[in-house]
């Protein structure tokens, strides 16, 4: 070997190899640039399944009975490499299901158990999810056996439900149908902290004022699911912790009764692990060595499993019989006084004073040894907070009521992000309709669509009226938790009919016209609202010299006010809508960033966003009739004028106020139009400008109309399952 060869062998043979690890991205170089990547996730390039694979159809082929039996058998099939406490994996599986579902937050519908994202960073390596990697490996033989008919997302949620059944709880039911993603989500904001479990006073704190938690977050620290089990910032104080519990659970759509039920029911079985030194634990899965094969928190200095495992640092079981569903949690919590102690790992925990020997749980590995039960600071909040205490006492005195309330709350926890009941699959789907499922009755599809369209066209409503009303009805859809959308026509009900963004006065004028047409034709109001938007677009395209038929799928139903939880729907209120060039007020986040967020929640791509904004502007759909961004002299005609004038270099753009710009002639300096940041971004951002230029081309006037119609139809049908 020559010296030259020896020297070259030490170098990376692929000169761009660093691009696969720690390269600086465009966002690093230009932090203010838009992250359009959130609009381009989970596509064919990352999904290994064929394009015609439909999980909702595939899961229907699953042998549900066999799966249930396999999971029940797995619960007591302890593995030497990660032994089950008391020979039962129930507590571990419940914690896994809970932590997968518990990331859901109502503000944007993101998080939750619906995608199997617990397999990926950052969730797979959060401190609060320590050792849940072991739970997934224990489940792997079942996933391997059932293959494509069973997603990880369904299995992770179902394992906890089966764990409860195996320990004696009558569960409320279960619905399959969660489809896996194949890489981490890029759209979820988990917080701005730069370290795990950063205290409240850290420089990037999620708190302000009197412990006001930043929206949309629903956990008190980076890396936790809900609250710190040791207390606020690790300092025990049950009443302060009660505040954190109430806020975080409310942001997951749980009331006080559901909160107590879930806290107690979650801690009725299983145990916390802290019998050792946390300093001996290796890194989390994403930081572990390659030969650890995706497992983290490994203790390579001592036994580190079973009785010697360290997870939260708290050590012990909450109840006397941790593998059996019973009312023991409240018996211990309410009948004993508790004092603060430190676990072997140094974590704060509460232990009973003068407890009877028979009330102590036995050791997980030695039935001849008993230990004190424990409570976390959150558990003590169930006793110390006056409202939680009342609920706890009722549950204590009525075990059947507690069991039913918990079963329902657990079902809600594990299904909250699945959307309407129509998406549930399997033999155990409950027949009962629940208000949080946003029920919509079946609609009529057997009516003369052309006759309805003719009545709409003759109604005297303008293109703007028709398109805007349909848009406002449909834009509430969130692909995150499948809530909102045009189905149900809730745009005519409280609270939506009164939202500022929906222009209540316009709705009060337009909706009665459409409701009368629905009554006369047998169509639902929901269908007529969407059809009106389609009619408006067809008229606008025709006025521009293009004949087009907007596709329509009938059969939407009309929800009633009784089917609508007003408070629950308040979180869907738009505080901004870049498509209609509207902001309720100025925010710290820029209007264009909010447009991206809205677009991602609606399930649209950057190209679809571009063509929709350009089309909506020329159709005259701006909120309040604003002229900002209406770059056309032919309002009401579906033309590509927005893009033509946006990209025309005979104009200059000058700021004249916050989020306001004037478009002036370079030559005369006369003001031609006004615009907002949402308009300008399509000429400023290099990617969006590329799309804008495409639609401004002389040969793409027809393509613009075709693409607008396709994107519009996607929005109108987004909630049809």
UniProtKB/Swiss-Prot annotation:
Active site: 99
Pfam family, one: peroxidase
Cofactor(s) the record lists: heme b
A biological process term (GO) from this entry: hydrogen peroxide catabolic process
Site (Transition state stabilizer): 95
E.C. designation(s): 1.11.1.21
Residue numbers binding heme b: 267
Record's keyword annotation contains Metal-binding: yes
Cofactor note (record): Binds 1 heme b (iron(II)-protoporphyrin IX) group per dimer.
UniProt KW keywords: Heme, Hydrogen peroxide, Iron, Metal-binding, Oxidoreductase, Peroxidase
Gene3D superfamilies attached to this UniProt entry: 1.10.520.10, Peroxidase, domain 2
Position(s), cross-link Tryptophyl-tyrosyl-methioninium (Trp-Tyr) (with M-252): 98-226
Position of the Tryptophyl-tyrosyl-methioninium (Tyr-Met) (with W-98) cross-link: 226-252
Gene Ontology CC, one term: cytosol
Catalytic activity: H2O2 + AH2 = A + 2 H2O; 2 H2O2 = O2 + 2 H2O
PTM info: Formation of the three residue Trp-Tyr-Met cross-link is important for the catalase, but not the peroxidase activity of the enzyme.
MF (Gene Ontology): catalase activity; heme binding; metal ion binding
Family statement drawn from the similarity comment of this UniProt entry: Belongs to the peroxidase family. Peroxidase/catalase subfamily.
Subunit structure: Homodimer or homotetramer.
PANTHER family: CATALASE-PEROXIDASE, HYDROPEROXIDASE I, BIFUNCTIONAL CATALASE-PEROXIDASE
UniProt cross-references to NCBIfam families, sorted A to Z: cat_per_HPI, PRK15061.1
Function, in words: Bifunctional enzyme with both catalase and broad-spectrum peroxidase activity.
Protein name, UniProt field: Catalase-peroxidase 1
């Amino acid at each position: 070997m020559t010296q030259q060869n020896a020297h070259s062998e030490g170098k990376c043979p692929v000169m761009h190899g660093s691009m696969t690890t720690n390269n600086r991205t465009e966002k690093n170089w230009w932090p203010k640039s838009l992250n359009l990547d959130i609009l381009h996730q989970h596509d064919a390039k990352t999904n290994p399944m064929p394009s015609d694979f439909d999980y909702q159809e595939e899961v229907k082929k699953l042998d549900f009975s066999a799966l249930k039996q396999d999971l029940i058998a797995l619960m007591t099939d302890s593995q030497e490499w990660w032994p089950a406490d008391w020979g039962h994996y129930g507590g571990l599986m419940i914690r896994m299901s809970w932590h997968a579902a518990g990331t859901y937050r109502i503000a944007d519908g993101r998080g939750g158990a619906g995608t199997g994202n617990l397999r990926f960073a950052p969730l797979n390596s959060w401190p609060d999810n320590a050792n849940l990697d072991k739970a997934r490996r224990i489940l792997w033989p079942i996933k391997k056996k059932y293959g494509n008919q069973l997603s990880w997302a369904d299995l992770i949620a179902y394992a906890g439900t089966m764990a409860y059944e195996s320990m004696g709880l009558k569960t409320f039911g279960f619905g399959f149908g969660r489809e896996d993603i194949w890489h981490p989500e890029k759209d979820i904001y988990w917080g701005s902290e730069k370290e795990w479990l950063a205290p409240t006073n850290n420089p990037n704190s999620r708190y302000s004022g009197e412990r006001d938690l930043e929206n949309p977050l629903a956990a008190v620290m980076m890396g936790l699911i809900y609250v710190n089990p040791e207390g606020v910032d690790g300092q025990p104080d049950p009443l302060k912790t009660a505040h954190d519990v109430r806020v975080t659970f409310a942001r997951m759509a749980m009331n006080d009764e559901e909160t107590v039920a879930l806290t107690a029911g979650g801690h009725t079985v299983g145990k916390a692990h802290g019998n050792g030194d946390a300093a001996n634990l290796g890194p989390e899965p994403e930081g572990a060595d390659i030969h650890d094969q995706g497992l983290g928190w490994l203790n390579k200095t001592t036994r580190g499993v079973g009785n010697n495992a360290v997870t939260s640092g708290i050590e012990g079981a909450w109840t006397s019989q941790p593998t059996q569903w019973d009312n023991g949690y409240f018996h211990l919590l309410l009948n004993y006084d508790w004092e603060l102690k430190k676990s072997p790992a140094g974590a704060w925990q509460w232990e009973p004073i003068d407890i009877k020997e028979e009330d102590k749980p036995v050791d997980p590995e030695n039935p001849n040894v008993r230990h004190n039960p424990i409570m976390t600071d959150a558990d003590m909040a169930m006793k110390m907070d006056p409202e939680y205490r009342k609920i706890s006492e009722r549950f204590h005195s009525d075990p059947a009521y507690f069991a039913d309330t918990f079963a329902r709350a657990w079902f809600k926890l594990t299904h909250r992000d699945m959307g309407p009941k129509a998406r549930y699959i399997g033999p155990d789907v409950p027949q009962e309709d629940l208000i949080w499922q946003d029920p919509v009755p079946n609609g009529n599809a057997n009516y003369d669509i052309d006759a309805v369209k003719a009545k709409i066209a003759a109604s005297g409503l303008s293109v703007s009226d028709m398109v805007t009303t349909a848009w406002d009805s449909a834009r509430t859809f969130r692909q995150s938790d499948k809530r909102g959308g045009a189905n149900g026509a809730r745009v005519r009900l409280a609270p939506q009919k009164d939202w500022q963004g929906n222009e209540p006065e316009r709705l009060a004028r337009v909706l009665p016209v459409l409701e009368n047409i629905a009554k006369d034709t047998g169509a639902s109001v929901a269908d007529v609202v969407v059809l009106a938007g389609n009619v408006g677009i067809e008229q606008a395209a025709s006025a521009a010299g293009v004949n087009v038929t907007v596709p329509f799928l009938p059969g939407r139903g009309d929800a009633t006010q009784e089917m609508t939880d007003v408070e629950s729907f308040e979180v869907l209120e738009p505080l901004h809508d870049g498509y209609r060039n509207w902001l309720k007020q100025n925010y710290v986040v820029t209007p264009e960033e909010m447009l991206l967020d809205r677009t991602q929640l609606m399930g649209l791509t950057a190209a679809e966003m571009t063509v929709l904004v350009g089309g909506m502007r020329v159709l005259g759909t701006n909120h309040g009739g604003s002229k900002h961004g209406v770059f056309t002299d032919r309002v009401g005609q579906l033309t590509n004028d927005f893009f033509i004038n946006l990209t025309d270099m005979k104009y200059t753009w000058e700021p004249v106020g916050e989020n306001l710009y004037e478009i002036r002639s370079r030559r005369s300096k006369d003001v031609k139009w006004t615009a907002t940041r949402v308009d300008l971004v399509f000429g400023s951002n290099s990617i969006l400008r590329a799309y804008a230029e495409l639609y401004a081309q002389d040969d793409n006037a027809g393509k613009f109309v075709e693409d607008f119609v396709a994107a519009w139809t996607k929005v109108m049908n987004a909630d049809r399952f």
